UniProtKB/Swiss-Prot annotation:
Cited SUPFAM superfamilies: C-terminal UvrC-binding domain of UvrB (SSF46600), P-loop containing nucleoside triphosphate hydrolases (SSF52540)
Subunit architecture: Forms a heterotetramer with UvrA during the search for lesions. Interacts with UvrC in an incision complex.
Disulfide-bond pairs as recorded: none
Family affiliation: Belongs to the UvrB family.
CDD domains, sorted: DEXHc_UvrB, SF2_C_UvrB
Origin species: Oleidesulfovibrio alaskensis (strain ATCC BAA-1058 / DSM 17464 / G20) (Desulfovibrio alaskensis)
Protein name: UvrABC system protein B
Segments of this protein annotated with the region Disordered: 609-628
Annotated InterPro entries: Helicase/UvrB_N, Helicase_ATP-bd, Helicase_C-like, P-loop_NTPase, UVR_dom, UVR_dom_sf, UvrB, UvrB_inter
Motif (Beta-hairpin): 93-116
Domains (record comment): The beta-hairpin motif is involved in DNA binding.
Gene: uvrB
GO MF terms, alphabetically ordered: ATP binding; ATP hydrolysis activity; DNA binding; excinuclease ABC activity
Subcellular location(s) of the protein: Cytoplasm
């Protein structure tokens, strides 16, 4: 176990409220305080404060973010601050995920369909590898960290230590690699595979892309181990000894597999008896056929498709016992920082019930054994039991966090840059489009950027089309766009590939775009989740990293939420102004590098974003072409709409025949949407 020291490398030092906040947080952690709140305004450097707290306490940390976009941003920042420590990224590796489901009313079974991002899968393996091999670890994670992952005990038990001079035959090593789910591939050499050439075996570990291991044998002895470039074969260095970690988190030794198979067979026997006694013969046949096929695969290969549904048996857990997850890989003294806690905490609490409802139907109708219910995210109470010390980080903490921390709130109002909270004003909705166009052109003339928030995806897409048609370079951002492309779009905005970004709630929490000087909020007087006091304050904050930051709310009335948000913003502005006057500080805009360590992960997505086309499913960031094409469908007759659907269906079938499944899936989703419009017209 490597015991390195957390060490920040930065040209900046804590300023404003940061030094006091770092001291208070660190002292509370050392004193054993279990829960505390860091209430920091947008742009006050909460990430920098978290980093210095970690450095001062010298403990492993988990940073829990509300979505992949913010997790990626935090990953960039912590990697830059801790270049010599293990900063890793752990989010869902699905670019697209359609869970297995059954709809009893229509007798429709929906098979699991997914697309795994290989880069993110590698980063997940790198995260667990780091946790098991060193102590200077910071993991940036989404709510994916509470989902079942496979037992850390079995994962660590199945590692393969290798050393130059070790007595081990090549056949023995090949067998062990296959046991931990590496695949032999002598032609397509990639992560998680190995190849053999004479007395040389080369393997790319699951947590690497750019480096491979070359093991040279002399008889039944490992003669040498070298690190090589998998593409060129060039030797990068000699390795005296190393450890090869499994290619999957769901691994187990043969004895445990045999025990698990026996347990699964017994559960199947009992379940079949129950179905047959109730004369549910269809369910019995379905369950027996599916389960026996899975068991055959497990016995022959050591795994099967959907093996996670048998994780309770593989882990040796009892019914109802929670699964192992990323939290179980951490040492007991780790610190949890819940970023944007006002939304992240509720996310954690919501995961279990949604998952349970879907799987219960599968179990009831014979698609899965009851043990599949234990392949699940943690319940909130189980999540809390796994925590040691927690810091809730938010500009607008909810009542739950404030109560949980029992009044231990560390405030961070003064920004290191001297920036004040943005000026806010309310303008009438009459003529708002013309006014917005004028403001956008004014900002772009000064090489600044604009964020516009709407209430719905359709409004975001239509507004983007309108702005584009009027000569304003604009794109939209919402939840239909996959993770990597979201990051690419944000980077493209910063690089001035376009000037105006239109979105919904994705533009609220945490997005760090210092080039933005104007945030325009449409329908600001529509009370609700997206226009609550907390949401408005968060949205205001997107303009708080620029010295010329301003917020314009378009509304015909001023709601209580608007009033409260403006009053709180003015209170903070006054406190910040007085501090600047007292210390002779001149506000300056935040400066942030455009290049990030995460660039390699979304370079393809950036290319797609620049073209206005996405790699993911459904309607992506293709605002000018796709949105325009779909929008015109509203104005055509039912007959023409039917013709358009038929044309798209032909394209979908052709794409499927050509194995262009992503394109086929995108066309399928557009066809569904057009059919809904056709029904509305009827």
């Amino acid at each position: 176990m490597q015991d390195s020291v957390f060490r920040i490398e930065s040209e900046y030092v804590p300023r404003g409220d940061q030094p006091e906040a770092i001291t208070q947080l660190s002292d509370n952690i050392r004193a054993g305080v279990a829960h505390q709140v860091l209430l920091g305004v947008t742009g006050s450097g909460k990430t920098f404060t978290m980093a210095h707290t970690i450095e001062r306490c010298q403990r492993p940390a988990l940073i829990l973010a509300p979505n992949k976009t913010l997790a990626a941003q935090l990953y960039n920042e912590f990697r830059a601050l801790f270049p010599h420590n293990a900063v890793e990224y752990f989010v869902s590796y699905y670019d697209y995920y359609q869970p297995e489901a059954y709809v009893p009313t229509s007798d429709t079974y929906i098979e699991k369909d997914s697309s795994i991002n290989d880069n993110i899968d590698k980063l997940r393996h790198a995260a667990t590898h780091a946790l098991l091999t060193r102590r200077d670890v910071i993991i940036i994670a989404s709510v994916s960290c509470i989902y079942g992952l496979g037992s850390p005990e079995y994962y660590a038990k199945m590692v393969i230590p290798v050393e130059a001079g070790q007595h081990m035959s090549m056949d023995s090593l090949i067998g062990r690699l296959v046991d931990v789910q590496y695949e032999r591939n002598d032609y397509d050499f990639h992560r998680g595979t190995f190849r053999v050439r004479g007395d040389v075996l080369e393997v790319i570990p699951a947590y690497h892309h750019e480096r491979a291991l070359r093991l040279e044998f002399f008889g039944d002895e490992i003669d040498s181990i070298k690190e090589i470039d998998p593409l060129t074969g060039n030797v990068l260095g000699d390795v005296g000894k190393t450890v090869i970690y499994p290619a999957s988190h769901y691994v187990s030794d043969r004895d445990n597999l045999n025990r698990a198979v026996s347990d699964i067979r017994e559960e199947l026997r009992l379940r079949l008896e129950e179905y047959r006694q109730g004369n549910r013969l269809v369910e019995a046949q379905r369950l027996e056929q599916r389960t026996m096929l899975d068991l055959e695969m497990i016995e022959e290969m050591g795994y099967c498709t959907g093996i996670e549904n048998y994780s309770r048996h593989l882990d040796g857990r009892t019914a109802g016992e929670p699964p192992a997850c990323l939290l179980d890989y951490f040492p007991d003294n780790f610190i949890l920082f819940v970023d944007e806690s006002h939304i992240t905490v509720s996310q954690v609490g919501a995961m279990y019930k949604g998952d349970r409802s879907r799987k219960q139907t599968l179990v009831d109708f014979g698609f899965r054994l009851p043990s599949a219910l234990d392949n699940r995210p943690l319940e909130f109470s189980e999540f809390e039991k796994r925590l040691n010390q927690v810091v809730y980080v938010s500009a607008t903490p909810s009542r739950w966090e404030l109560d949980r921390s029992e009044g231990i709130v560390v405030e961070q109002i003064i920004r290191p840059t001297g920036l004040l909270d943005p000026l806010t004003e309310v303008r009438p909705t009459k003529g708002q489009m013309e006014d917005l166009m004028t403001e956008c052109r004014s900002r772009t003339a000064r090489d600044e950027r604009v964020l516009v928030t709407t209430l719905t995806k359709r409004m975001a897409e239509d507004l983007t089309e309108y702005l584009t048609s009027m000569g304003v370079s604009a794109r939209y951002l919402h939840s239909d766009i996959d993770t990597m492309e979201r990051m690419a779009i944000i980077q493209a905005l910063r690089r001035k590939e376009f000037d105006v970004l239109v979105g919904i709630n994705l533009l609220r929490e945490g997005l760090d775009i210092p080039e933005v000087s104007l945030v325009a909020i449409l329908d600001a007087d529509k009370e609700g989740f997206l226009r609550s006091t907390g949401s408005l304050i968060q949205t205001f904050g997107r303009a708080a990293r620029n010295v010329d930051g301003r917020v314009i709310m378009y509304a015909d009335s001023v709601t209580r939420s608007m009033t409260a948000a403006m009053q709180e913003t003015e209170r903070r502005r006054e406190k910040q102004r007085l501090y600047n006057e007292e210390h002779g500080i001149e506000p300056v805009s935040v400066r942030k590098s455009l290049e990030t360590p995460f660039d390699t992960l979304y370079s393809d997505a950036r290319s797609a974003a620049a073209k206005g086309r996405g790699k993911g499913r459904g309607r992506q960031a293709a605002p000018a072409q796709t949105a325009a094409e779909d929008t015109t469908a509203y104005g055509i007759s039912a007959e023409e709409l039917g013709g358009l659907i038929q044309r798209l269906e032909r394209e979908m079938r052709e794409s499927a025949r050509d194995l262009e499944f992503e394109k086929a899936a995108e066309l399928r989703d557009r066809i569904r949407m057009l059919r809904e419009r056709l029904l509305q017209q009827d």
